[in-house]
Swiss-Prot record:
Stretches of the chain forming a coiled coil according to its record: 35-73, 400-456
InterPro entries, A to Z: Kinesin-like_fam, Kinesin_motor_dom, Kinesin_motor_dom_sf, P-loop_NTPase
Record's keyword terms, sorted: ATP-binding, Coiled coil, Microtubule, Motor protein, Nucleotide-binding
Any Gene Ontology CC annotation: microtubule
Region ranges (Disordered): 561-625
Protein name stated in the entry: Kinesin-like protein KIN-14U
Domain Kinesin motor, chain residue ranges per copy: 79-404
Top-level taxon in the UniProt lineage: Eukaryota
Species: Arabidopsis thaliana (Mouse-ear cress)
Composition bias, Polar residues: 588-608
GO biological process: microtubule-based movement
Classification via SUPFAM superfamilies: P-loop containing nucleoside triphosphate hydrolases
Designated gene of the protein: KIN14U
Pfam families listed in its UniProt record: Kinesin (PF00225)
């Protein structure tokens, strides 16, 4: 077999076993890329990969800058922020001529019994505020959760003021929880320097007990039957809080996360009161655990938590008319809310001791309310005149939470400096985000070019290598002697190296080695099978000749066997095996016409006196197997 190095051609020479002259066959690969084009393509891939590496470094640097700027903005505004949302009047409610509640962009004024009280907030959402507007103010804190900070979003307020609507919403107007989950997946999909995974858990705190809302055992059972699941609050050496026994599911997309969220909502404890027909009688806590890992080798996984909490409604027993178990539920809710207020107030005042152990709610949120955490509380109030007492109680709670960090406590000059600093940071944030967006677009474009170039390179060069390996065995190799040695892997490697188009980083891939090994095994197996068939035929012919009882036949057979040996000794060619006649004409015609396996078929002898019966052949063949 000859290989043309100029055009990548394989020439098949004339077979030595064929009696007729065979015209040499030429196989030409039309898909071969010229060497200079292959080298140019390889160089282009290398340059593009270097550009991808540089773009990722720039993107990582800008992302770190964005994280720092965002953290400064949130800290300047306050790591614990309090918003207020005023519920609109319902269609069944009578709207008074003079409303008791008036509000501005960051304050609420309550008028009652000839007096007025003013409460300040970081932001006030009016009655006409939409779900999208509320989420717009919450969205930046979600980015902090992806950046590695623990984040806590709480909905607080009197029963019937719209806490559950703000957190859950409806199918037409989704609430904060579904919007936040969707935003997390959107942000994670655009992060080209980190891989992000999410796990989800839901539980409720009912009268001081923990209930797993995503457990497979949850159904329409009574709480006493379903509360047997053991959930224990534990704190590790680093201060991270874990709940032993709590179900945690990995969510791969928003659809699956929304399904689990709806499942947990359906088994939450609710009850009828004078104020609300479906009053929440517990605190519902949804936890999204975020695992963020860099693409660089040796990067560590950052773990952060996002808590979205729909707190039970604060209420006065005289207003709700609760008795029995409903009254006990209300008391338990009020006690845990009071403990939460104490913790937030202590954190805002930066006290040395924070009373986390006063309730299960604050124990669970210990690592999400303290240092490096971001807290956002949404206080809900009613505009009705009948609810003024409960409204004042809710706003007084938030006043404790905001503590001494009221903007009114600052002088006009300090207030202007604070606003100017926030404005400058927000401008820097926009510039950084715009830079990240441009780099991401360019990075995506370059990665597409790299993939296209690599695909072209593999299609052309790898196909040529496969053709060489396949054509290394000539289509007429089966006509050669059975002792011919197949082409070894060393020769194939030399063929590859001599072609000159294989790039340095593809000279020894796993795929090529596997194809090499499989090809060699097939060639060796084919040669071995041909040798075994030839050996069996030799033994078969010998056994037939020895079984003949006629001495004359033995002499004729001996002469017919020794003559080729003498001729072979004189000419230097190997002897031919003894041949016999077979009476089955159809089998004889089939064997004579079969040119693909000349060594495995049985041919006739020129001496008619040494013919054997077909039954003898069958009997001897069965004994060989």
């Amino acid at each position: 077999m000859l290989i043309s190095a100029e055009k990548g051609e394989i020439l098949i020479p004339q077979s030595p076993l064929s009696s007729e002259s065979v015209v040499p066959l030429v196989y030409t690969d039309v898909n071969v890329v010229p060497e200079h084009e292959s080298n140019q393509l390889e160089k282009s891939i290398s340059n593009l990969e270097e550009e991808v590496f540089e773009l990722k470094l720039k993107l990582k640097s800008l992302d770190e800058k964005r994280k720092q700027v965002l953290n400064k903005i949130i800290d300047t505004k306050g790591s614990i922020r309090v918003f207020c949302r005023v519920r609109p009047f319902l269609l069944t409610e009578r709207r008074p001529i003079r409303e008791p509640v008036s509000f501005g962009p960051d304050n609420v004024v309550i008028r009652s019994a000839g007096s007025s009280k003013e409460f300040e907030f970081d932001k006030v959402f009016h009655q006409s505020a939409t779900q999208e507007e509320v989420f717009g103010e919450v969205k930046p804190i979600l980015r902090s959760a992806l950046d590695g900070h623990n984040v806590c979003v709480l909905a607080y307020g009197q029963t019937g003021t719209g806490k559950t609507f703000t957190m859950d919403g409806t199918s037409e107007q989704p609430g904060l929880a579904p919007r936040a989950i969707k935003e997390l997946f959107n942000e994670a999909s655009m992060d080209q320097t980190h891989s992000v995974t999410f796990r989800m858990s839901m539980l409720e705190i009912y009268m001081g007990n923990l209930k797993d809302l995503l457990s497979a055992r949850q159904s329409l059972k009574s709480y006493e039957a379903s509360a047997k699941c053991n959930l224990n609050i534990q704190v590790d050496s680093k201060g991270s809080v874990e709940i032993e026994g709590l179900t945690e599911v990995e969510v791969m997309d928003f659809t699956k996360a929304r399904w689990w969220y709806n499942k947990g909502r359906r088994v939450r404890s609710t009850s009828w009161t004078n104020v609300n027909e479906t009053s929440s009688r517990s605190h519902c806590l949804t936890r999204i655990t975020i695992f963020r890992r860099g693409d660089a080798v040796g990067s560590k996984t950052e773990v952060s938590k996002l808590w979205m909490i729909d707190l039970g409604g604060s209420e006065r027993l005289l207003k709700t008319g609760a008795i029995g178990q409903t009254m006990d539920e209300g008391r338990a809710i009020n006690l845990s809310l009071s403990a939460l207020g104490d913790v937030i107030a202590a954190l805002r005042r930066k006290k040395g001791h924070v009373p986390y152990r006063n309730s299960k709610l604050t124990q669970i949120l210990k690592d999400s309310l303290g240092t490096r955490s971001k807290v956002l509380m949404l206080v809900h109030i009613s505009p009705r005149d009948e609810d003024v007492g409960e409204t004042i109680c809710s706003l007084s709670f938030t006043k404790r939470a905001r503590a001494v960090e009221s903007n009114r406590g600052l002088t006009a000059e300090l207030q202007k400096l604070r606003e100017k600093k926030i404005s400058e940071l927000e401008e820097e944030m926009e510039e950084t985000q715009e830079g990240c967006k441009k780099i991401k677009a360019r990075l995506q474009e370059v990665e597409c070019l790299v993939n296209e170039h690599k695909k072209l390179f593999w299609i052309t060069n790898d196909k040529y290598l496969e053709d060489i390996e396949k054509k290394a065995i000539s289509p007429l190799d089966h006509l050669k002697d059975t002792d011919a040695t197949p082409i070894s892997s060393d020769k194939l490697v030399k063929i590859r190296k001599s072609s000159g188009f294989v790039p340095r980083f593809m000279t020894s891939t796993v795929a090529s080695r596997q194809r090499q090994t499989m090809s060699e095994k097939e060639i060796n197996a084919k040669a071995q099978s041909i040798r075994s068939v030839a050996k069996n035929l030799t033994q078969f012919s010998t056994s037939q000749s020895l079984s003949l009882s006629d001495s004359r036949s033995k002499a004729l057979l001996r002469r017919s066997y020794t003559k080729p040996l003498q001729a072979a000794a004189n000419s230097g060619t190997p002897p031919e095996t003894p041949k016999r006649h077979i009476k089955d004409n159809s089998l004889q015609r089939k064997n004579m016409n079969d040119t693909s396996s000349p060594r495995s078929k049985m041919v006739t002898s020129s001496d008619p006196n040494v013919r054997a019966k077909l039954c003898h052949h069958k009997r001897r063949m069965s004994s060989l197997t």
